Amino acid sequence: MNVILLDKIANLGNLGDQVAVKAGYARNYLLPQGKAVVANESNVKVFEARRAELEAKLAADLAAANQRAEKIAALEAVVIASKAGDEGKLFGSVGTRDIADAVTAAGVELAKAEVRLPLGALRTTGDFEVEVQLHTEVKAVVKVSVVAEA
C-alpha cells in the first residue's frame, strides 16, 4: 500500500515522502495516528496544498523538543528512592514510568514512551545516565540517582 507521510517516521521516511508499506502497518498504525494518508490523486493534491502548514508544524515540534532537551540537560541528577536490600539490590525495579514521573516532578514534562532503557529496568542503587528521545532527531540524557529508602 502506498502512503504519503505527514510526519517524519524513523526507518521509513520524512514529511511528504511517498512510501510503500504493508497494508496492516498502514491501516493499524499510520492512518489512525494521522501519520500518513493513502497515496491517491485527491490526497496528493490536498497534501501539496497543506505542505507548508505541515512543514511549519514539524519545525515547531522540533524547536519545542530542542527546548525540552536544553531543560533536561540543565537538570541536576533526578533522585528516585526505592526499597533496597543490604547490597544495593532493589526490591522491584525502577522503570520508564518512575523515571518519567521523577523528571516531570523536577519541572520538565516527560512521557514514559520517551524514556529509553535498552537494558531493561534499573534493579540496583547507584547513578545512571538514561537516554530520552524527545523527537526523532532530538535525544537527551537524564542523570538518575537511585537511592535506598531509609
Curated annotation (Swiss-Prot):
Keywords assigned: Ribonucleoprotein, Ribosomal protein, RNA-binding, rRNA-binding
One Gene Ontology cellular component annotation held by this UniProt entry: ribonucleoprotein complex
Domain of life: Bacteria
BP-aspect Gene Ontology terms: translation
A GO molecular-function descriptor: structural constituent of ribosome
Disulfide bond among keywords: no
InterPro entries linked: Ribosomal_bL9, Ribosomal_bL9/RNase_H1_N, Ribosomal_bL9_bac/chp, Ribosomal_bL9_C, Ribosomal_bL9_C_sf, Ribosomal_bL9_N, Ribosomal_bL9_N_sf
Family annotation (SUPFAM superfamilies): L9 N-domain-like, Ribosomal protein L9 C-domain
Family classification: Belongs to the bacterial ribosomal protein bL9 family.
Stated role: Binds to the 23S rRNA.
Family annotation (NCBIfam families): L9
Protein name: Large ribosomal subunit protein bL9
Record organism: Shewanella sp. (strain ANA-3)
